């Protein structure tokens, strides 16, 4: 059984029927049901603060039903990564490295050996390639 960190875009694809990647939802959910899930709080902030929360109230129940399973889903506090992520984002703002704050926090988590090994499930593979030896899984390829 793997541990898989799920990026915001994957939650949107699974539970927002209007998302361009929703066609992958069934495959994604089958995979997630087989593994332990790591959910960094920033991905919840990003997911819930999008069109998802504003327009798709009923589908949020699917997300919360999935996430509220403490035997499979592990919420990770981002406090330890916030300041460094902010600092990196602002120092790289004019260097052509445009990562979002959420993506930077995920990248820092990927570097944190204390979290143990995990894979990252994301449609935005390019945002995470090259961080340690973390496996990056593109949902279109599962």
Task: Write out the residue ranges for each language-model feature.
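Acidic, PIN/NYN-like endoribonuclease modules and their adjacent C-terminal/linker elements
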Residues: 1-3, 107-142
């Amino acid at each position: 059984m793997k541990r898989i960190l799920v990026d915001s875009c994957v939650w949107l694809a699974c539970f927002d029927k209007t998302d361009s990647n929703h066609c992958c939802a069934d495959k994604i959910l089958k995979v997630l049901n087989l593994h332990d899930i790591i959910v960094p709080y920033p991905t919840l902030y990003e997911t819930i603060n999008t069109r998802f929360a504003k327009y798709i109230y009923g589908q949020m129940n699917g997300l919360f039903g999935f996430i509220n399973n403490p035997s499979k889903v592990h919420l990770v506090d981002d406090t330890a990564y916030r300041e460094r992520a902010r600092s990196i984002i602002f120092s790289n703002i004019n260097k052509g490295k445009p990562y979002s704050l959420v993506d930077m926090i995920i990248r820092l988590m990927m570097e944190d050996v204390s979290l143990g090994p995990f894979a990252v499930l994301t449609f935005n593979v390019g945002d995470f390639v090259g961080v340690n030896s973390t496996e990056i899984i593109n949902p279109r390829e599962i």
